[in-house]
Every structure is written in C-alpha cells, then in structure tokens.
Amino acid sequence: TMSGFDALPADARQDRLEPSGAGWEKALANVKASVAGAELPFPQGYVAALFGYRRAARETFAVERSIWIAAPRERVWRAITDPAQIEMWFSPGTSWQLSALEVGGRLFVRNPETGAEMYTQVIELIDPPHRFVTRSAPPETAHVTTYRLQEERGGTRLTITHAGYELEPAEMRWNNMEQNAFGFGMMLENVWAYVEGRTLPYPGGF
C-alpha cells in the first residue's frame, strides 16, 4: 500500500497515481523473480530516494524530480553551477564552459570538430544557494530548467523542474516527458553520489 498522494498538487495527482501503480507491479514482478532465482524482468529497478511527478497547469507542461543529499546547500550549489564540477557528474571527459555566473551567462560544451557551442543553457535567474534557472538556447526548444535547493533534515533537498513541453508537438510531448523524467532521475542520482563522495551510478554521464 502506498499513500500520500493527497499531498500532491491536484493537477499532478492523477499523473503520479498511474505510473506509481505500474511501477509497483513491475517491482513486485522483480521480487517474484528474485525469490525464484530467475532473471529480473525489469533490471533497471526503481530508486526509492527519488521523488517526482509530471504536471500540466495553465497549459504549461513540466517534469519534476527531487532527491535528498547529505550535504549543505552551499556544497550542492557549487556542484550544479561550477563547470568543472558539472563535468565530473554530468559528462565525465567532456569539458563544460561558463561565460559568467550571472543572468545572461551561457553554460555550454564545444563541438570538438567545429568549436561551436552545443547544449547551450542561458542563465535566467541566480539566487545562491536557493534557486538557479536556465533556458535552453536555439536551435533547441526553449525549455526552462529550475533547480531549487531547500534545507531538509540537516542536508539538502535538490528539486529540478523542467518546463516548456507545451512548445512541443502534442504527439511527442508525453513520450518526451517520460524519457526526460527518467533522465533527470539518473542525473540527480549522479549529483547525489558525486557530492557525497560515492561511485557514480551512471559513470558514462548523459
């Protein structure tokens, strides 16, 4: 039995209920296979430390994930805003560059063949160590990513909200949201491991 859905925003409740039910069915199938000594039908498993949902409000579609990290907000803030540290947990071996840690600053990697910017994120808001907001630059769809850092139980709750899916074709939207929800979960696990000095669960990055 899993409860607590009444605490979610009303517009997110149903979207959380449906995938949670399917997730528990898969988890039970894994338990059954493990007890029987058989191969797990869903080897990727599920991470209880992560919390997230997708929501639609005022025609704005977003994915949201969060994780608790045993470190102060200042430490987590550096991990998500310092290009050298981003490289360590996001894309080991691929150097990130930041023009300036200020509104309008650009965070990006260089195309190894042409030298052009790739995966550019433009800083929209910076409020250390509480909130960090970026927007993807053209030619990418203008998604806005918000990082919120909250003190919790002597550590930090890091929450990522990725919005802008309403700009995508309707037939692609939910599939992209599902894939990105999984991807942001992986990303948060890597941040958690990096900050706490653990082995990265996804050492190849993203």
Annotate each language-model stretch with its function.
Residues W24-A27, V31, V76-I80, I86, ...:
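Hydrophobic pocket/interface hotspot
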Residues A62-E64, A116-T120, T141-T146:
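Short, surface-exposed coil-to-beta transition loops
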Residues R73-E74, E124-P129, R148-R157:
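A short, structured loop/turn motif at beta-sheet edges
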Residues L50-W96:
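Hydrophobic ligand-binding cavity/cleft-lining segments
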Residues S66-A70, F108-R110, V122, R148:
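Generic structural detector for well-ordered beta-strands
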Residues A33-A57, A193-F206:
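Short, highly charged C-terminal tails/helix-capping segments
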Residues W96-A137:
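Glycine-rich portal/gate segments that line the openings of hydrophobic small-molecule binding cavities
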